[in-house]
Amino acid sequence: MELTVNGKKLGRQKMPKNGHLKWKAVYQPGKVVATGYKNGKRIMTETVETTKPAYKIVMKTDRQAITADGRDVCVVTVEIQDAKGRIVPNACPELTFSLKGDGRILGVGNGDPSYLGPDHPADNDCHEFSIPAFNGLAQVLIQSSHKPSVLQLSSTAQDLKTGSLAIQTQLP
């Protein structure tokens, strides 16, 4: 494995079986490139860059449609990104989720082991809920009703571009 920081090579080390590697380096903003070799040939390259300030909220899901049966749930991943679309790992803004349509916000999460706030609404017909992001990430669970519709989820935070996502609910 070879490590390069801002164009300066810090050296190449052999990976011990089931082990790890470490280099002595002083933190500086920029780009770190790790290049893996096997039998002298490059087999992988991974790059990590320092991000710019948080700029926008991006919401993603692997399911664009859920069943309108009152039970089906869509997991939405929320990312706080910089202007280049990179997750900002130190961004922890308060996110407010708003849902329009025949569904509800079932719960939220942020992965912060020290977060003691509520992770689900007190009422069963919740259409707005807030939680801080943690390390640039959060999740929100959206549950269908029995009525097919298009659910519109938005997320806002101070000084960030709003994120939005449409989820279709369909009869079984």
What label would you give each PLM region?
Residues 1-45, 61-62, 80-84:
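Long hydrophobic segments that form regular secondary structure
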Residues 4-8, 44-47, 73, 84-121:
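Short flexible loop/turn segments that cap and initiate beta-strands
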Residues 18, 68-71:
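Solvent-exposed, conformationally flexible loop/turn segments
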